[in-house]
Amino acid sequence: LNLQGQELNPHTYSICKSDMLISGEDPDNIKLGSSLSEDHFEGKKFDYMITNPPFGVSWKSEKEFVDEESKNPYGRFKVGTPRSSDGSLLFLQHLISKMKDEGSRIGIVFNGSPLFTGDGGSGESNIRKWIIENDMLECVVSLPDQIFFNTGISTYIWIVTNKKKSQRIGKVQLIDGSTFYKPMKKSLGSKRKEISSEQTESLIQTYHKFEENEFSKIFDNEFFGFTKVTVEQPLIENGKEVTKKDGKLKPDTKLRDSERIPLTENVEEFFKREVKPHLPNSWMDREKDKVGYEINFTKYFYQYKPLRSLEDITSDLLELEKESKGIFKEIVNE
């Protein structure tokens, strides 16, 4: 077993080297510098990789270097780059570049942004598209909020691999671990919750069983994809539709809209069923089609809670009316 790593923050870097010394590992295996612009392990491949990159941190200071490498068809960022305000998905591409051909595994902790930020055709969406269509995303586990010292936001563990077990091929497992916690007796910064060893084991077993239940959902890769289709409507002038020189209708750019059509749907059939009845004169400009991917995690675990009955609400109001000494009755009678 050989442990290696890289850290940008000098303080954290020093702590890591000290920990390596205490553990009997070689502290020289820990390097100082940015993984994005100063890769100390260029060309090296690893079996297992774990990281918790900074949440929502700008990479503008390294933009020139990253943009240049993204032009290289063999570079780490060849698929695309996210917006410069959040470099999370750059770190994931960095790790994927270090996967062994015979199979590697990655565990990376993100906030919610990499799951859905960016519309079809954007850098973020193209990166998700590449990862999912190449069947590398194995599982996403949502964690409770308030488990980090310096932030109370919800976080997610992505498990990425280039060698899935046969039953997981073409599938993505989502695990809702947001309720797997116990409150701490004393807060530590923003950290007010912790995951017990029993709860950790329960999450691990949920992952290994690979079954659908209240906390686990399994989807085909294609489920997360959509085609963003541009919908046009004719330009009307003096009560008449305007045509172009080629005889085709001229679109009204002010009425231009788009539809996200799931990849599991036939685009033409969806358009006829969902759009045409409401916009009978509309048409699709298929030359502008863009395929995107997103994971709307909360939506998949949403559980409908029925509204209280009118009788229950009335009963409560009458009880309040009694307590308020007839004020409610006076208002209603008026």
What does each model-found stretch correspond to?
Residues 3-7:
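Conserved SAM-binding motif I beta-strand of class I
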Residues 43-329:
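A conserved structural/catalytic subdomain of Rossmann-like adenosyl-cofactor enzymes
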Residues 11-15:
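Short alpha-helix immediately C-terminal to the canonical SAM-binding loop
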Residues 8-10, 39:
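AAA+/P-loop NTPase substrate/partner-engagement loops
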Residues 25-35:
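Conserved SAM-binding strand-loop segment of SAM-dependent methyltransferases
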Residues 35-43:
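Short conserved loop adjoining the S-adenosyl-L-methionine
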